Amino acid sequence: MSLKSLKLFSYTFIIGLMITTGVSMANSLPEHFTKTLDNGMQIVVIPMDNNSGVITTDIYYKVGSRNEVMGKSGMAHMLEHLSFKSTDKLEEGEFDTIVKSRGGVNNAATGFDKTHYYIKTASKNLGLSLDLFSELMHNLKLTDEEFQKERDVVAEERRLRTDNNPMGYLYFRVFNTHFTYHPYHWLPIGFMQDILSWKIEDIRDFYQRYYQPNNAILVVAGDITPEEVFKESEKYFGHIQNKHTIPKVTAVEPKVDGAKRAVLHKESNQVDTLAITYSIPNYEHDDQVVLSAISHILSSGKSSRFEKTLVNEKQLANQVYGYNMELADPGVFLIMAMCSPHASLDTLEKEILAELEKIKNGDVTQAELDKVKINTKAEFIYSLESSNSVAGLYGDYYVKGNIQPLLEYEEKLDKITLKDISDAAKKYFDHNFSTTVILKKN
């Protein structure tokens, strides 16, 4: 059986088992173990007991675009790029070379609330991975020459993914419009004006403040024991000292007091696009699980309401999706759509709102909700087979400060009722307090 066939069989088996036994299942999460070093660095280990000989080592820093200030946006993302340059022990590019020479893979990502770096490799390379991450934490050189070259790379990334991409540009601008005061006002890539005006001293200061042990969480998942990880973590990170007080984010977005609407025009744009956002609570709120179920009803798969009605039947959109963002601070439920070439943008917007009204009015069947529960649970359980997914799952919650929503997720999903769905839709999908951004084709 091929690997692809094996994965398909595994996923199909999970769904079949859930249908046979009923939607409700016990908590599927593997047990995890934690320890905090004397310098405040948190260690999280998730043994998977799968005899794979593979682990994912993922280091999270509690810093993202949320920790930036206006005029200095995008620095967390820029620092992520520079972290693979030279250190006291490594030449530029040597980090990647070492990982690949051991048959491993590595990558990094910056979000609103986090920056993280991971290495997936053989379990025997745990010490090597920790040694590399230790270098990144306290020995980056951050030379001006490396900075200037990488700034050009980041600026080009901004042009490619945001400025010259209709959906990317709309995504950036809807956050600019929805959030007026909170740092979620911009995306992790930052404003182009800021990218071009950074100084290397800005990046060095950002690094010194946020890349410290008491602002980091090390997550190791896979074929490994907690004892091994705790011992090696002490060896490679226990001696690193905290040198600066980490600034706290105090910004609170004012309560929305009305609807916002912006119509944008971009000379190079060749397609009408639309974004609608609604304010929702942060990741810890019980309603997040219900909002996630609503997002699946609206836009998960070919039988979802947006896909079936707006894309296939009425052919109003080439693509349309909606999802709840689980952020450290209150965030948004985001809907984005790309209009079909010969369709009316006004009609598309009205039809999107009509679909939301249906959910508010209780037009969701028990069979529809059960299908969402089964598929969501199956996807969740299937993701637990990968050390990458497991490390990312635990890391994403620990870095935001609370693992409890993850531990309670399956139980809360099982308990969702049709009334919960309609109540949440009524509570949050109030168009009198929404943000709508339209990007018109030229």
Identify the meaning behind each predicted range.
Residues 1-6:
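N-terminal secretory signal peptides that target proteins for export/translocation
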Residues 22-26:
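Sec/Tat signal peptide C-region and signal peptidase I cleavage site
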Residues 27, 180, 188, 213, ...:
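An aromatic/glycine/proline-enriched structural segment found at the starts
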Residues 51-68, 74-78, 92-137, 169-193, ...:
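M16 family metallopeptidases and their MPP-like homologs
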Residues 73-87:
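Active-site SXXK
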